[in-house]
Amino acid sequence: MKITWLGHAAFLLEGSMKVLIDPFLTGNPNAPVKPEEVKADYILVTHGHGDHLGDAVEIAKRNNAPIICIHELSRILSRYDVETMGMNMGGTARTGSIAVTMVPAWHSADLEDEQGNIISAGLPAGFIVSMDGVRVYHTGDTDVFLDMQLIGELHRPDVMLLPIGDYYTMGIAGAVKALELVKPKVAIPMHYNTFPLVEKDPEDFRKAVKAKGLDVEVVILKPGESYEFNK
């Protein structure tokens, strides 16, 4: 599987299908591509905050790609003439050659509508994406929580995409603890250096993982760079 970081929490997973996650491109100073340049078969949105929902509707319309998200958010997005697949915690959607399992995240998840009103958009989530024998865990925005150990035991992800930026999510110490709980083979940090409040040096994360003695490869990507994971 080819994993490309598009800045912030946005990733493109490519194998037999193209799966786009949290496509915050417009307004993202680190985005390496424009929304109209992205091709996707499915779009996953972890929650309704603007820096995660991002350009999902526009990209979905252009690619005729379903948006997979929590049920309440799917009902809101369906008003914009896009196909949605509303899920809930613990459920798995099997579609095409992929399986997407929704898992909890510890965050908030409201949505600002076009009139500036704050409305409920369901719970925040993470996703386990299984494609071509590889399992990727995108945590969404979250703090570390003990049930991550269960997620690791149940799903055994190969690659974990997790925030390190602090302030709005867990920081480096929390992310290291999350790796202890989940035990992936590879960790790719995200949700940092987009804005001043989440400025972090990812090398500090790598050093902290090494200092803890964890058997996890830390892969640091620049926006637009890719990593290939093959079993």
UniProtKB/Swiss-Prot annotation:
SUPFAM superfamilies: Metallo-hydrolase/oxidoreductase. Keywords: Hydrolase. InterPro entries: Metallo-B-lactamas, RibonucZ/Hydroxyglut_hydro, UPF0173, UPF0173_UPF0282_UlaG_hydrolase. The keyword Hydrolase applies. Disulfide bonds: none annotated. GO terms for molecular function: hydrolase activity. Pfam families: Lactamase_B_3 (PF13483). The keyword Hydrolase applies. Belongs to the UPF0173 family. This is UPF0173 metal-dependent hydrolase AF_1265. It comes from Archaeoglobus fulgidus (strain ATCC 49558 / DSM 4304 / JCM 9628 / NBRC 100126 / VC-16).
